[in-house]
Structure formats: C-alpha cells, structure tokens
C-alpha cells in the first residue's frame, strides 16, 4: 500500500479516536466536525430519519448525553475502498439505565480532515429508561 494510503488510513483512524476520546472525557471540542456536518443517530432529538445539521446542534446534543455516558472502549476500525470514510466498532457504557451499547459509528471525512457526515448505528432500546 502506498505511503499516502497508509497516511490517509491513519488520519481516518485518528479522527475516529478523537471522537471516542471526546465521549470518554465528556469534551467534544477537539472533534473535527465540519460546520455543516450531518449526523444521524437513533437517540437524536428527531430520531434516526431526521439528521442533526450543523456543528453547534451536534455539540449541544452530545453535551446532553454526558451525564449518562460511562466507559468507552474502541474495538476496531473499518475503512471504505476510497479511504473517505471510517467505521469504528466500540462499546459505549451508559450509566442510567446501566447498559453497554454495541456501536458502529461511521464518519465520512473530507480532504481537509473534517467530518462531513456521521451515522451512529446501535440498538437504543436498552438505553431508554423504562416508563413507570
């Protein structure tokens, strides 16, 4: 594999790991989201079908999750053929209700190293508190 492909793969991996480190540290300020990033997640305010658009909205949503985030463990990374996206398998601990989400988050990254699209894949049912 040519050096530029290795470098691109390492760059994608580093961007993903910055994201997961941000979750673990409850500080997403280092995550390189593009200003017009599009993020889809099952627990997003409008659900999976309606994406959050824009870095400010994404930051605000992640900050709302901080109180229930527990241990974060990155397991492995997968790359698309043209090295424009990385998907990372991780375990994301939730403290209330206590559970572990088995997650695959996909990041599309532009040539400037900014995340332009993100899609989070997990089954959210165990993270939703039971209603009384």
How would you describe each model-predicted region?
Residues 1-28, 35, 130-132:
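Short, low-complexity N-terminal intrinsically disordered segments enriched in polar/charged residues
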Residues 26-28, 55, 112:
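Residues at or immediately preceding the N-termini of alpha-helices
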Residues 7, 50-53:
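Alpha-helix N-cap and loop-to-helix initiation/capping positions
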Residues 36-51:
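A short gly/proline-enriched turn/hairpin at secondary-structure junctions
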Residues 29-30, 78:
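Short secondary-structure boundary/capping segments
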Residues 2-7, 59-132:
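A beta-strand edge to alpha-helix "cap/lid" segment located at domain peripheries
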Residues 13, 17, 56-59, 63:
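Generic alpha-helical structural signal
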